[in-house]
Amino acid sequence: GTQDRLDYLIAERAKHRYMGLDTQIIGPEEIKKLSPITNVDGVLGGLYDPLDGHLDPSGTTHAYAKAARMAGAEIELRCPVLETNPRPDGTWDVVTERGTVHAEHIVNAAGLWAREVGAMAGVYLPLHPMEHQYLITEDIAEVYERDEELPHVMDPEGESYLRQERQGLCIGFYEQRCDPWAVDGTPWTFGHELLDNQLERISDSVEFAYRRFPILERAGVKTVINGPFTFAPDGNPLVGPVPGLRNYWSAVAVMAGFSQGGGVGLSLAEWMVEGEPSRDIFAMDVARFGNWITPAYTREKVRENYQRRF
């Protein structure tokens, strides 16, 4: 709803064109036509990506795993790593509950446990998990009676994002009253369970969302999801060779892990095999943070980055 925000989107469009993306700046009328459930009062314009969409996370993950196996990879499930010990020649012994694996290279892609796995090699990786909440609504006639799926909508003013979820809606928030999670470390026993809902934290964001998307007032809430994901202090992933350790690589703090995973994996593979990635990924280089960084600094900057997501 401000000229500054629109100017930012115009600058983003220029960046997208440089990268070969055909995004467009559109006005309120076009926004309303594409997303009839959006209240465009006070909206000056938006940035539209006609190729935007979403994938099934489970199916995509299994497709990656199948492709890896076809290329000769072996995947060991439920096999915790206990130690990572360097040898004088730069190779590594990875000690697991099922024995020790001798590896020329190792990659820390441990997600929520990246800090703990890094500590096994004496490395501090500056990242921190944050709690994040989103809502899934009951079925909505205005959604499932459409001939085509609703587009994703990101509302910077309301600090929210919305997309169609089957016959209802999914709406998530980057609230100001946010909380770091697992300050003392991610429990090894943490699995796929969710965290307790903290609806009071997102009450202001929900109230704004009901004005931006009035249809939500008539929609029942089917599920409230609260789960953790990781951020680096500047919001970018930590990718590449870890300074001071031979053949130890990082692919962590990938906040949008599912959507960024393919690009991070490709860049890291090129780096390991060819000696450098084919694209400039300086903004993701794990080496951009020096020895000066501390857990306290990381935690505060991660909170700030979450609050400024939009």
Locations of regions flagged by a protein language model:
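Flavin-dependent oxidoreductases
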Residues: E83-D196, D204-R212, N291-F310
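Short beta-strand to alpha-helix junction loop
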Residues: G1-Y8, L47-M70, E76, E193-S203, ...
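Helical element adjacent to the flavin cofactor pocket in flavoenzyme catalytic cores
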Residues: L47-H105, W113
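Short loop/edge segments at beta-strand edges and connector loops
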Residues: G27-P28, L77-C79, T223
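C-terminal catalytic lobe of FAD-dependent flavoproteins
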Residues: E157, R166, W188-F310
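Active-site catalytic microenvironments for nucleophilic, acid-base chemistry
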Residues: A67-M70, M120, W271-G275
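Dinucleotide-binding Rossmann-like beta1-alpha1 core, especially the glycine-rich loop
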Residues: G1-L34, E157-Y161, R166-G168
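A short, glycine/Asx- and small/polar-enriched loop/turn
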Residues: D4, I37-V43, N85-D93, F231-G235, ...
